[in-house]
Amino acid sequence: MVIYLLAGFFLLLFIVLSFIDRRRISNGIILTMALFFSVLSVVYATFSKGNELLVSVMGTVLLLLVLLIPFFVVGIATMLIVNGRLMLKREGRKLANMLPLIIGLGILALIITWFGSILKTGSPILGIVVVFIVALVGYFSFLFLSFLLSTFLYQFNFPRYNQDFLIVLGSGLIGGDRVPPLLASRLNRAIKFYDKQYAKKGKRATFIVSGGQGANETISEAEAMRGYLIEQGIDENFIIMEDQSVNTLQNMKFSKAKMDAIMSNYNSLFSTNNFHLFRAGIYARKAGLKSQGIGAKTALYYMPNALIREFIAITV
């Protein structure tokens, strides 16, 4: 009975908090708890009924799941290693691109150490260390699952076509002055919304291109984005540059200042890549913006590394 109440409580709490504000990782944590207790409820209900067929089926399913766990973990580690090698090949040998490879090798090392501790039963210290590491990995795995749920659910935004401003978040430039494909996808996503809003409502939104100038860049990201929008046929009178920000939180804060200076009551929307959408939403909330986001598609091979980096940025 308690399990049912906990499942219902966490599910109801998730619905209420999501309705208030979807831009919180705590929503994902609560949903994970709701799913966990829901599964426990199903298992408990099955065994409590005493139906031999149902109990046999459920017992078989649970046994198979337990037996598959090691293969599942090794499979994830292998996929991360393969993805890490692909990232290094396509994106260059940078530490940030090595994250999937490092984590994949770390998981395999943990598995080997775990089996080593089982075989070497005479070393209690090794056993304690392994248990501690496994508990730590379990904790962060729970948080990562909650983050993935939050990120996935936040993709389903259906903004109204009444926006006054479209904020496009910057990223690094190619050759110091050119818009890379990643940034172009953000701009194209904003243009698509701009065109659709104008077609439906006859209302033109103003673009705010937000991004400062990096050490290896000859112009600001905002200036490069402005040039890209003009090339795509956007009237320069509907483009505002915010060229001082150096991170996502500043993107939001400085863009808000630009919008506040123009009007006091407005609707705004930000555009970024789908993997970055949830964290950008968190920073929008911290900056005092009611803005929700729209996400541009990202190459599939890039997603594992990008999501790991987003998770680290949120939790650290």
Which ranges hold each PLM region?
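A structural signal for short, hydrophobic/glycine-enriched beta-strand patches
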Residues: 155-307
